[in-house]
Swiss-Prot record:
The name this protein goes by in its record: U3-lycotoxin-Ls1n
Signal peptide extent: 1-20
Domain comment in the entry: The presence of a 'disulfide through disulfide knot' structurally defines this protein as a knottin.
Propeptide intervals in chain numbering: 21-44
SS bond partners: 48-63, 55-72, 62-87, 74-85
Organism name: Lycosa singoriensis
Example GO molecular function: toxin activity
Highest taxon of the lineage: Eukaryota
Cell compartment(s), UniProt: Secreted
Cellular component terms per the entry's GO annotation: extracellular region
Tissue: Expressed by the venom gland.
Keywords: Disulfide bond, Knottin, Secreted, Signal, Toxin
Record-stated family: Belongs to the neurotoxin 19 (CSTX) family. 01 subfamily.
Pfam families documented for this protein: Toxin_35
Length: 115
């Protein structure tokens, strides 16, 4: 019986040690991947077109707002023949961002009350 107990403790110890090493390896890989994604995002962010600026040269270059990417909207100004394109945020996305911000504030208040 002592042998079975000793063998069980040894098995549990080895299992926990091996799983801890595997988790460390995964954490390191995740950190490296996250850093590379952040670097790529920073590099990409330098090339984006700000809101209300001309995006006719590249219609997919609009910057991101807090939650959503702006959309290149083209129109013909009154009395003009030239098409004008600017990066704009659609109204429904603007309202969704505003609602998400209010929900975040409300969640903070609830945490403050009950946390």
């Amino acid at each position: 019986m002592k042998f079975v107990l000793l063998f069980g403790v040894l098995l549990v110890t080895l299992f926990s040690y091996s799983s801890a090493e595997m988790l460390d390896d995964f954490d390191q890989a995740d950190e490296d991947e996250l850093l590379s994604l952040i670097e790529k995002e920073e590099a990409r962010a330098k090339e984006c077109t700000p809101r209300f600026y001309d995006c006719s040269h590249d219609r997919h270059s609009c910057c991101r707002s807090e939650l959503f990417k702006d959309v290149c909207t083209c129109f013909y100004p009154e009395g003009g023949d030239n098409e004008v394109c600017t990066c704009q945020q659609p109204k429904h996305l603007k309202y969704m961002e505003k609602a998400a911000g209010e929900a975040k504030k409300f969640g903070g208040k609830i945490k403050k009350w009950f946390g």
